[in-house]
Regions:
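Long, low-complexity intrinsically disordered regions
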Residues: 1-263
C-alpha cells in the first residue's frame, strides 16, 4: 500500500495540480476528462477540477465568482459539454462533467430520482410528464406550454437538475443572437442499461452509489474520507456504513483518514 505522501504526489500529477501539467488545448482537456471520468468546474473538494488544471490567471482578479475563472479557457467546460459529455448538477447543485462510463454508473440513480420526484411533488410531476410527452424542450416553449414565468420555471427545474432527473443543454442562436437552454429528462439523454432482475430497489441504489463513489475516488486518486458524503446530492441513499462496506469488499483502502481505490 502506498503512503499518503506517495498518493498525494500521484494525485498532483494525475489531477494536474502543478503548473508544469497545465492543460494547453481543448483536446488535451478532453483527454483529461476521459482519463479521470468526471471533472468539477472549479476547485471545491478533492474531486479533479477542470479550471484548476488550466493554471491560468483569472479573468478578473479583483472580482469574486466568475471573475476567478480562467481568463481565456473558461469556455472549455461548456465546449466539452458540446462535444457530447454530460454536464450535470448532481455535485450538490454544482455542475460536473462526466464521461459516458460514469453516466452509466449514474443511470440507475437518476432514473430512480425521476420516479421519486414524480411521486413527491405534483409540480415536479407535471414538468417531468410534459417532457415525457413533448420530448426535450427549450425554456421558452416550456414557459408557454406550462403557463409559467421564467422565474417560476427556474425555481421548478433547480431541484430536478440537482437530483439528475432532468438535464439542461445550453443553446446559442446566431440570428438573432440569443442564449437559451433545452431541458430533457435523464432517460431522454442516456440510454441506460438493463434493469436489475427482481432485486430490492433500495439495495440496488445503495450499491449504485457505492459504484459511483469508487469511480469518484479513482478520479481524485486520494481523498479525505469525511468528504465522500458531500460529493453528491443524494443524501437519502447514503449509509454511514457504505465506506466500511467498500473497504471490506476490497474496493477502497483507508490511508491516514483518507481513502483511495484498492490496488
Amino acid at each position: 500500500m502506498q503512503t499518503l505522501a506517495e498518493l498525494q504526489e500521484r494525485r498532483a500529477y494525475e489531477c494536474r495540480l502543478t503548473p508544469g501539467r497545465a492543460l494547453e488545448t481543448l483536446n488535451e482537456a478532453e483527454r483529461f476528462l476521459c482519463d479521470r471520468g468526471l471533472l468539477t468546474r472549479t476547485t471545491d473538494s478533492a474531486l479533479p477540477s477542470l479550471f484548476e488544471a488550466c493554471h491560468e490567471e483569472p479573468y478578473a482578479p479583483e472580482s469574486p465568482g466568475f471573475g476567478q475563472w480562467p481568463a481565456t479557457k473558461f469556455p472549455w467546460f461548456g465546449k466539452l459539454g458540446a462535444r457530447g459529455h454530460h454536464i450535470l448538477a448532481v455535485h450538490r447543485g454544482k455542475n460536473m462533467l462526466v464521461t459516458d462510463a460514469v453516466a452509466t454508473l449514474l443511470d440507475p440513480i437518476c432514473r430512480a430520482e425521476i420516479e421519486r420526484m414524480e411521486r413527491t411533488d405534483p409540480d415536479w410531476a407535471r414538468l417531468l410528464r410534459h417532457l415525457a410527452r413533448a420530448g426535450p424542450s427549450e425554456l421558452e416553449d416550456l414557459q408557454t406550454e406550462l403557463g409559467l414565468k421564467a422565474k417560476e420555471l427556474k425555481k421548478l427545474r433547480a431541484p430536478l437538475e440537482r437530483c439528475g432527473a432532468i438535464v439542461p443543454r445550453s443553446i446559442v442562436y446566431e440570428q438573432p443572437h440569443r442564449h437559451t437552454s433545452e431541458l430533457a429528462r435523464w432517460d431522454q439523454v442516456h440510454s441506460g442499461r438493463a434493469d436489475a432482475d427482481g432485486g430490492d430497489a433500495e439495495t440496488d441504489l445503495h450499491h449504485s452509489l457505492g459504484d459511483l463513489l469508487v469511480a469518484a475516488v479513482r478520479a481524485a486518486v486520494v481523498a479525505p474520507e469525511r468528504e465522500l458524503k458531500r460529493w453528491f446530492s443524494w443524501q437519502w441513499y447514503w449509509d454511514d456504513l457504505l465506506v466500511d462496506e467498500l473497504v471490506h469488499d476490497g474496493r477502497l483502502e483507508r490511508v491516514d483518514d483518507h481513502v483511495t481505490v484498492a490496488e
